[in-house]
Amino acid sequence: IAAMRTLEGKIPGLRVVPLKSVYPQGGEKVLIYHLTGQKVPEGKLPLDVGCIVCNCTTVAALAQYIQTGMPLVRKCVTVDGSAVRTPGNFWVPIGTPMSFVFGEAGGFSEPPQKLLYGGPMMGIAVPDAEQPILKNTNAILAFGAKEAHAPPMTACIHCGRCVNHCPFGLRSTDIAAAFRAGDGAALERLHVSVCMECGCCA
């Protein structure tokens, strides 16, 4: 942060704003709200409120392309999870199979039961380790048997903590009930399309 702040006076319009490291602070609409005070309306895009959100990797790749003509051909990928022998960050050519990258991290300490593109909260499950690293792959995770299986669901006690933790104040218990009932009209009334699937309510 200190290094970035040295550039504030040198680049017109640049302002460095440190934010608390609280999940899901990196969510696009969450960032916009905390930086500008604006809420992106339901069904709208950041551009509709005058914002463009780019992560650091994208900005760095754009700068490299402008300066050298070299397109994005590799990514820095975090390799982690309970089944990974030696977690770490690795520069990986796009298109490399996940199996090769896991091998570079020492292989598996136990047979993986779940593989993910992305983080543990919003990652996407993949069927096998032969899936390629993509240009938007920031992390790959491998979990053993203990972490791979969700605990049994328990009955809601209506404590309201899920609503308090939702960055958009959605009523997740009502959304879940409407989903189970197949009530599309209720889901629309509950603004289910605003949900970013961050998992905070769970």
Role assignments for model-derived ranges:
Residues 1, 111-113, 173:
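Glycine-rich phosphate/pyrophosphate-binding loops
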Residues 1-98, 104-109:
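Hydrophobic alpha-helical positions that pack around
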Residues 2-10, 125-132, 202:
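Short glycine/threonine-rich loop-to-helix capping motif typified by GTGT followed
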